């Protein structure tokens, strides 16, 4: 195996493990909190918002630690190992007052690995525009494996999801040590607070096209999290069997569109491809909205919304990461990836999850319907 092939294989396994962890708990946490712990809708929204808090802490951690003191692969290893321990402690937290802060601690450890992993991959791949989507494709496979793994051993309402994710996180941490050495770029340099926080990347906002791109990403993130916060609760109330396995079709779609993304970027460019991604999100919510009316087409509409995931995610977020990498010069590339992570998984996620939880709480029914629905979908 050539050195290039070996690198791609290691990065692919890294992406697989990283998203296996996420997939093993993120979708199923909603039913777990609603059914097992009896949390209210607003509390469920806040719990999903913990990921956003982690994303807002992430640029500081990456800017302060990764760029100045330690190699990226070592930070990934430490965060993976610590994150695994925290995940295994989460099932002990059965009240919101204990669960919420523990989840924030975990997210503060996990979210930085997303930007660090992307930055490390883009640094070492010789042709990022072609190779990065192929490597990143294994993240979708990892998410599917996480969902199927949980579905095979337990239900979505079970705390087992956190033990599964915790074990995977420990493996992820150990495997990270096999990644190519990526030393800090600013060792011994005097670094300003602005550089630590990644504020240098804000210079990109002077370009109108980049500013519009960031605004669109922020706005689309708000409704995006209605899907992640509410879908699991919605399908649980509809009494969907094998819910985790069925929702994993979203990641099957993800794999397909990962493979198609290089063609679309060559044929249409970033602007049109990203617009297609936004249009697919609109179509997805129309499908889910009409599915709430019930009827013979309900299942078809829900599956349509699930299968649109690949185009929704890859044409918008993966294309967006590649666009940012192309727009930023080498000096601020890491900060630029941190900026987009802050927008996508930070501010946008926090606003989206908060609103999604409030809307879920507002539409809770005083008494479940004859069909067992606890919310007015």
Predicted features and spans:
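Helix-loop boundary and gating motifs at the non-cytosolic
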Residues: 2-52, 209-248
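Juxtamembrane intracellular "pre-TM" segments in multi-pass secondary transporters
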Residues: 1-5, 179-216
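A membrane-interface helix-boundary motif in multi-pass transporters
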Residues: 152-168, 358-377
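Cytoplasmic helix-loop-helix junction between adjacent transmembrane helices
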Residues: 104-138
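Helix-to-loop junctions at the C-terminal end of transmembrane segments
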Residues: 57-71, 153-154, 256-270, 360-361
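C-terminal membrane-cytosol helix-exit motif in multi-pass small-molecule transporters
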Residues: 154, 166-186
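Structural signature of the two symmetry-related core transmembrane helices
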Residues: 74-88, 272-287
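Conserved MFS/SLC helix-loop-helix module at the cytosolic interface between two early adjacent transmembrane helices
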Residues: 57-94
